[in-house]
Amino acid sequence: MASRRRMLLKVIILGDSGVGKTSLMNQYVNRKFSNQYKATIGADFLTKEVQFDDRLFTLQIWDTAGQERFQSLGVAFYRGADCCVLVHDVNVMKSFDNLNNWREEFLIQASPSDPENFPFVVLGNKVDVDGGNSRVVSEKKAKAWCASKGNIPYFETSAKEGFNVDAAFECIARNALKNEPEEEIYLPETIDVASGGRPQRSTGCEC
């Protein structure tokens, strides 16, 4: 039976409440945006199948709550992550200042085997707000912080308009892939019901 090789890549999105983590994830996976804000309770995730160099990968993107009272949930959700995405709102300085706290918390709770080289990606979201007139975190400032932490890739995004979202997540996926050990999942291309083959469980991917 023909089979496809698919690798699961786990990505964690962290940042203060309201910076647009859920919106970025929904824009990338579902091509949808909602103006109605609803705080994430605990954690949630979406999956998307992507392909690089004739290989299939399933991105499992975890959106965690930014509220302090849920941070104790971190250990269970952070463990096994292949890449961590840190998001701030370019219009809210506090959300940028807190990036270091989120980064440190992830490293403590996830306990990656090589913390010095663990892949992070930083997103400066909501660049569309007020035509950019409300922003208080400059691109230069954000890039300088990323450089000081080991040259973390940086993207400015708008979840609302879809600006730079695909490019950012392609970088995220490629960085996650570099960190993933060589473990592959073999999935059948077709299911022969007559021979008693079991249907494959849906991954929830938006393919």
From Swiss-Prot:
The keyword Cell membrane applies. It is found in: Cell membrane. SMART domains: RAB, RAN, RAS, RHO. GTP binds at residues 15-22, 63-67, 125-128. It is a lipid-anchor. Keywords: Cell membrane, GTP-binding, Lipoprotein, Membrane, Methylation, Nucleotide-binding, Prenylation, Protein transport, Transport. A lipid is attached at residues 205, 207 (S-geranylgeranyl cysteine). Its main location: membrane. One of its GO terms (biological process) is protein transport. Pfam families: Ras. It comes from the Eukaryota. Protein transport. Probably involved in vesicular traffic. Belongs to the small GTPase superfamily. Rab family. This is Ras-related protein Rab7.
